[in-house]
Regions:
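Mixed-charge, low-complexity intrinsically disordered regions
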Residues: 1-86, 92-159
């Protein structure tokens, strides 16, 4: 996927890392568009507070990308496109937006203290101008029935 949005951190964009070293790296994953949000999310991954992420299912279908698979490793990049960490997917669930629970919201590492707070932030992101432009749908909205991909991961290595 393009550096597009996953949850308020949307933008899971696996691609290969070339020319960064002689050792092979797992595919790249990008959290959000480059900028302050991505930098915040990457910092939360590096300090261990971010261990989950959420994407709309439509993000995967737009890019014709398969869903994450448990055990898959990905290289996290920062806003400068520098490889900073390797994460490993530990669980994947596709569910309606209304079913996201507090633990998943908290584990996104953005300081959410309620599902309502998490959802409001994610709705702003998913219904924001950048996401709508990326999706090619200026009227894109989410509701309780919108299918989302709930992914959990662990930090494997800081690069």
């Amino acid at each position: 996927m393009l550096p597009a949005p996953t949850g308020s951190d949307s933008g899971r964009a696996p691609r290969s890392l070339r020319g960064m070293s002689d050792q092979p790296h797992p595919p790249i994953v990008e959290f959000a568009f480059p900028g302050p949000l991505r930098d915040t999310l990457v910092a939360a991954i590096l300090d261990g507070t971010k261990t989950s992420t959420t994407s709309t299912l439509v993000e995967y279908s737009i890019e014709d990308e398969p869903l994450p698979v448990v055990g898959t490793r990905q290289t996290v990049v920062d806003s400068d496109d520098s490889a900073v960490a390797v994460i490993e997917t530990t669980s994947v669930e596709v569910a309606p937006l209304a079913s996201v629970d507090l633990q998943h919201a908290v584990d996104e590492g953005e300081g959410y203290t309620s599902v309502a707070e998490w959802r409001a932030a994610h709705e702003r992101y998913w219904q924001g101008e950048a996401m709508r432009a990326w999706l090619g749908d200026e009227h894109f909205t989410v509701d309780d029935t919108t299918m989302v991909v709930l992914e959990r991961f662990r930090l494997v290595e800081i690069l």
